[in-house]
């Protein structure tokens, strides 16, 4: 009965979290696009067969992501996987409305099967302090080994601590001691492409046609319409949303593919793999016994050498 209640509470919490995310997207659709929720909705797994994490499909720019995980952990123990998302201080990007806004960050950690987010009652005071204000969510109910975070304010979350609970092969024979791989991704800033395939305003806009810029119209919301007259005398109109800065002017001669705007993007996505060893306690005991044996052997050799030296001294050798 208790387990049934726990399952009901877990499913209810998961449903409410999804409802909250959907509500935020309905109210603020453009500001929410290309964050982890969209990967959850569009991909069964956040990692493609090629090894690429799907966040890179919308966040086209590459920037480094750093991860720190312990070399080895014990069974049924809590450890920290730290994801670092570095970028220069005081950098701002353009928001969906064209205004300058602080960067936000997000991260995904794909743990091996059996590893999962540690329950809060097992968090140390240090972990509680380091994760204050950070909300963790599982990629899906079935994939509790994949943990998502974000978007979060980047200025205070350039390092995100994931409290991880390791499995115990002694109580669950599905898991084994040995080396495991983690797949980690970290992002700062908005994406360049929406999941629908259309560009955001956080990308370079280029000309689809060669010709002469006939006119540039400024729309009331701050966006532009660039009218290009091609060699046939036809007018091709390029729409540029509010945000990127124009680098062309009327009467400029341009070729197909030439940039019409600067590159406003200051963020980027990065991914990496890490390894952790689930250490068997018997192996540790064996290793300790080995070192003790080596130490005793060295002591006995020293004692034997001294004994031989005494005998040789007594015999006058």
Swiss-Prot record:
Main localization is: membrane
Give any single GO term for biological process. Answer: photosynthesis
Checking InterPro entries in the record gives: Cyt-f_TM, Cyt_f, Cyt_f_lg_dom, Cyt_f_lg_dom_sf, Rudment_hybrid_motif
What membrane topology was assigned to this protein in its record?
Single-pass membrane protein
Q: Which UniProt keywords apply?
A: Electron transport, Heme, Iron, Membrane, Metal-binding, Photosynthesis, Signal, Thylakoid, Transmembrane, Transmembrane helix, Transport
Listed binding positions for heme are 35, 55, 58-59
Q: How is the cofactor bound?
A: Binds 1 heme group covalently.
PROSITE patterns referenced in this protein's UniProt entry, alphabetically: CYTF
Q: Which GO terms describe its molecular function?
A: electron transfer activity; heme binding; iron ion binding
Q: Does the keyword DNA repair apply?
A: no
Q: Any one cellular component term from GO for this entry?
A: plasma membrane-derived thylakoid membrane
**Span of the signal peptide:** 1-34
Q: Where in the cell is it found?
A: Cellular thylakoid membrane
Query: Could you list the residue ranges that cross the membrane?
Result: 284-304
The cofactor required is: heme
Q: Please name the Gene3D superfamilies in this protein's record.
A: 2.40.50.100, Cytochrome f large domain, Single helix bin
Subunit text: The 4 large subunits of the cytochrome b6-f complex are cytochrome b6, subunit IV (17 kDa polypeptide, PetD), cytochrome f and the Rieske protein, while the 4 small subunits are PetG, PetL, PetM and PetN. The complex functions as a dimer.
Tell me the function of this protein.
Component of the cytochrome b6-f complex, which mediates electron transfer between photosystem II (PSII) and photosystem I (PSI), cyclic electron flow around PSI, and state transitions.
Please state which protein family the record places this protein in.
Belongs to the cytochrome f family.
**Protein name, per record:** Cytochrome f
Provenance organism? Prochlorococcus marinus subsp. pastoris (strain CCMP1986 / NIES-2087 / MED4)
Mind giving the lineage of the organism this protein is from? Bacteria, Bacillati, Cyanobacteriota, Cyanophyceae, Synechococcales
Gene name? petA
């Amino acid at each position: 009965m208790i387990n049934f209640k726990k399952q009901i509470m877990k499913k209810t919490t998961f449903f409410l979290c999804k409802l909250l995310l959907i509500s935020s997207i309905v109210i603020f659709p453009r500001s929410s696009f290309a964050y982890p929720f969209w990967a959850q909705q569009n991909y069964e797994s956040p990692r493609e067969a090629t090894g690429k994490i799907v966040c890179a499909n919308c966040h086209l720019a590459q920037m480094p992501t750093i991860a720190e995980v312990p070399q080895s952990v014990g069974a049924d123990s809590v450890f920290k996987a730290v994801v670092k998302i570095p970028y220069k201080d005081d950098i701002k990007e353009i928001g969906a409305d064209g205004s300058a806004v602080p960067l936000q960050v997000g991260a995904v950690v794909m743990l091996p099967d059996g590893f999962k987010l540690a329950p809060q009652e097992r968090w140390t005071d240090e972990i509680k302090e380091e994760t204050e204000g950070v909300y963790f969510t599982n990629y899906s109910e079935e994939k509790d080994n994949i943990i998502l975070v974000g978007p979060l304010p980047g200025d205070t979350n350039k390092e995100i601590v994931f409290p991880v609970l390791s499995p115990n092969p002694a109580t669950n024979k599905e898991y084994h001691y040995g080396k495991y791989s983690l797949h980690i991704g970290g992002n700062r800033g908005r994406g360049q492409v929406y999941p629908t395939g259309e560009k955001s305003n956080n990308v370079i806009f280029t000309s689809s046609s060669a010709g002469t810029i006939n006119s540039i119209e400024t729309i009331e919301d701050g966006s532009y319409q660039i009218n290009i007259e091609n060699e046939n005398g036809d007018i091709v109109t390029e729409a540029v949303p509010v945000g990127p800065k124009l680098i062309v002017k009327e009467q400029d001669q341009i070729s197909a593919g030439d940039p019409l705007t600067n590159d406003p993007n200051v963020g980027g996505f990065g991914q990496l793999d890490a390894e952790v060893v689930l250490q068997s306690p018997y192996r540790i005991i064996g290793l300790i016994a080995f070192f003790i044996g080596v130490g005793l052997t060295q002591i006995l050799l020293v004692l034997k050498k001294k004994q031989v030296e005494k005998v040789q001294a007594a015999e006058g050798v």
